[in-house]
Amino acid sequence: MRAHRTQLCGAALGHLGDLLLGDPRRGHPVAAFGRAAAAAERVLWRDHRGAGALHTALCVAGAVTAVTALSRTARTLAGAGGATLVDAAVTWTVLGGTGLRQEALAVARALHADDVEGARRLLPNLCGRDPQALDADGVARAVVESVAENTSDAVVGALVWGAAAGAPGMAAFRAVNTLDAMVGHRSPRHLRFGWAAARLDDAAGWPGARLTAVLAALAGPSPRGALRAWRADAGSHPSPNAGPVEAAFAGALGVRLGGTLSYGGRTEHRPVLNSRGRAVRREDIAAAVRLSRRVGALALLVTSAAGALRAGRRAERGAR
C-alpha cells in the first residue's frame, strides 16, 4: 500500500504540474528520447520487420530501464519522498493535455479572428494534415479530431499505464507512442520497419482509448449520442483506437467527424463518424477542449481508484 500511495501522490502532482505548467519548455525528455530513437534507427534500419522489432524493443527497454533506475536511486537516497518526486516528474513529462489544449485554442483564436492562413500555419502543431487544402471549417474539424485522439494518447492512456505499472509503465507507453509517430506509418521507408511500433502502439493504446470513449460519453453534453456514434461508427475507422475516441467525441458534441482528408500529399476518404451530427464549426474547438479537460480529470480519478483497489487486494492476499 505504501508504494501505491507514493505512485498515487506522484500521479496527482504530475497531473497538477501539467495543468499549471504545461510541457517542459526546454530539454523535454520525450524530445531527447526521439533523438536517441532516430540515432538508433540510422544504425539499425533495414527494410525488414525484424529490424524494426529490434529497434522498438531496444528503445522501449531503454526508456523503462532509465526510469526504473532513476526511481530506485531516488528511493535509496531520499526514501518514499524521492520516489514520489520521480513519479511526479515522469507523469508531468509524459502527460500532454495542457499543451494539446493550448495548441487547439490558438487555432481557434485565429479562426475567430478570420485569420484562416494563420490557423493553417498553426495546425501542424497538432496533426500531420496538409493544411493548405482546408477551409476554416476543415481546419476546425481537424483540430477537434486531434483533440479527441490525443486526449487518449497524451492523457488517458498514460494514466492507465501509470496505474498498471507506475512510472516505468508511463515511460513505456510514451516511448511506444513516440515510436509510432516516428516510424509507424506507411511510407516506403517505414512500411516494414515501422510495423512492430505500429502494432505495439495499437495494443498499448487499446485500454486507454476505450476508457477515453466511456469518459467522453459520461462527461459530454450528449451521453446517448456518444454511445450511439461509438457503437455505430467506430469499427469503420481505420484505427482501432482512434475510431472509438473520435466517434464518442463526435456523438457527445453533436458533430460529424471523418470524411476526406490529406496527409503528405496523399488523399484519404475516411468514413463519417456520427452522421446525424452537423458539420464542425470553429466554436466546437472550445467545446472539444472543455470535454478533453473533463475526461482527463475523470481519468485521473478512475485510474487512481483502480490502483487503490488493486493494491488493497494485494495487501489482503499478503495478510492471509
For each of these PLM feature ranges, what is it?
Residues 1-320:
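Short amphipathic, positively biased membrane-proximal segments
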